[in-house]
A protein has these predicted regions:
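A charged N-terminal "starter" segment
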Residues: 4-140, 404-408
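Glycine-rich tight-turn/loop motif centered on a GG-T
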Residues: 50-62, 124-128, 142-152, 224-234, ...
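C-terminal accessory subdomain/extension
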Residues: 313-408
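Active-site loop/helix belt of alpha/beta enzymes
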Residues: 175, 181-294
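Conserved, mostly hydrophobic/aromatic
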Residues: 65, 88, 118, 178, ...
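Active-site-proximal beta-alpha core segment in soluble small-molecule metabolic enzymes
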Residues: 86-222
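Active-site loop ensemble at the mouth of alpha/beta enzyme cores that anchors a bound cofactor
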Residues: 229-231, 264-341
């Protein structure tokens, strides 16, 4: 759209007597455009019934959420570990603030860009629990390190040199954690020589400080059997302890051994190997974690739901919801309908969720609002701008999911 000043320049050479009239007409046109522009309202208003919220909306039961936060913090405190919750789970600074207020040491982010809204929110202890490769990302990481206490993972000598060059260029300082593969089969070194070489190099390079090891095993988090997860956690801890012992044998201090997740926190904390836990989903839970076996020692409630409205009732055995693939991901299975036995979320399309009504179940009415347990918390948060919080089915507030879409 042409601005007023640009329009003045365009009409200046001609029609001089009519310039003021033309400017007035343009201003009136612009004002009309602004006044007629439609803005998307917030999905909910504090004080209203949760069922009146617009859908699809991501909603958080504050009572269950706060209980989950307290339980994990108490578990970490009991075992003398720091809790560094993973912000990739929620991408919401307001959630991180509450975790820090309960005693969390800092946060994890998976990407450098993801950390920026948390920096803006005043959070100053950030671990990038990933390798950062490429000039643009390293330059941004160096700028982040000028403004916060930042650590990052490295598993490659070439990347370590590039990191050192980036921080040296701006005079920053960053802590390096060597990532070791403790069974995940993803990133991380496995050779003792590589672990030792990277730690020594990090100690020697200007602007870098060797801080310890990243030893995360994501694959075990969703192993259904409680006993199998315990065994896998024990093996991962043995590997991590072995690498730490190697470094200490060569006179290298290993301050931090960071890792662990929601599915393994019970065992990781009790292992005596880790110094901090990186769990994130514990605050919310999802259908995938809900399928795990849990002990009474450490189990969490479901606090996060996707609110969805019945938009069509085409057949007695089938209704259609307004929440599909653009509201939830399905790589970990389909959503589960909360509190409505006999209703099965059977298929997801872009903007439709097809629900099968089993024999004997009561079909929901057109316009009825249902709660869905999402299959996988992390990517679901990334699909939404706002988190609606509530207590006793009454809306309390709206929290921006400020880091959604920040995956660079």
């Amino acid at each position: 759209m042409v601005g007023i000043e640009s329009f003045k320049v365009m009409i200046a050479p001609t029609w001089v007597p009519d310039r003021r009239n033309a400017e007035r007409m343009l201003v009136a046109t612009l004002q009309s455009h602004v006044s007629n522009r439609l803005s998307l309202p917030d999905p909910a208003v504090p004080g209203q019934a949760l069922a009146q919220a617009d859908t699809p909306s991501l909603v958080l039961d504050l009572d269950v959420f706060e209980a989950n936060l307290g339980l994990m913090q108490q578990w970490a405190d009991r075992h003398g570990l720091a809790l560094r919750p993973h912000a990739k789970a929620h991408k919401c600074p307001e959630i991180a603030r509450r975790q820090l207020a309960l005693g969390a040491r800092g946060i994890c982010c998976q990407k450098v860009s993801e950390a920026l809204p948390f920096l803006d929110a005043g959070i100053r202890d950030i671990h990038i629990s990933n390798e950062v490769v490429g000039p643009a990302k390293l330059a941004l990481l160096a700028q982040l390190a000028l403004r916060a206490d930042v650590s990052v993972c490295v598993d490659n000598m070439s990347n370590l040199h590039a990191l050192a060059a980036a921080v040296a260029q701006v005079g920053a300082r960053i802590t390096v954690l060597v990532e070791v593969d403790v069974g995940q089969g993803r990133c991380g070194v496995t050779d003792d020589h590589d672990v030792l070489a990277l730690a020594r190099a990090a100690e020697a390079m200007q602007g870098l400080r060797f801080g310890g090891l990243q030893a995360y095993h994501g694959a075990m988090q969703h192993v259904r059997s409680h006993a199998e997860r315990a065994a896998m956690s024990a093996q991962a801890a043995i590997r991590a302890a072995g690498y730490a012992s190697l470094l200490r044998a060569y006179g290298i201090t290993c301050e931090r051994i960071t890792g662990g997740g929601t599915g393994s926190a019970e065992f990781d904390a009790a292992s005596g190997v880790y110094t901090e836990l990186q769990a994130g989903s514990y605050a919310f839970m999802d259908a995938d974690y809900g399928a795990n076996e849990w002990s009474d020692t450490l189990s969490f409630g479901t606090s996060l739901f996707l609110l969805s409205t019945v938009m069509s009732t085409p057949a007695p055995e089938r209704v259609v919801l307004d929440a599909g693939l653009k509201s939830t991901t399905i790589e970990c299975g389909l959503p589960r309908i909360q509190g409505r036995p006999g209703l099965v979320y059977a298929a997801a399309n872009d903007e439709h969720g097809v629900v099968r009504v089993q024999d004997g179940a009561q079909a929901p009415a057109l316009g009825e609002v249902l709660k869905l347990v999402v299959p996988h918390v992390d990517p679901c948060f990334n699909l939404h701008d706002t988190l609606v919080t509530y207590r006793d089915d009454t809306v309390v507030g709206l929290w921006p999911i400020a880091a959604r879409g920040l995956s660079r």
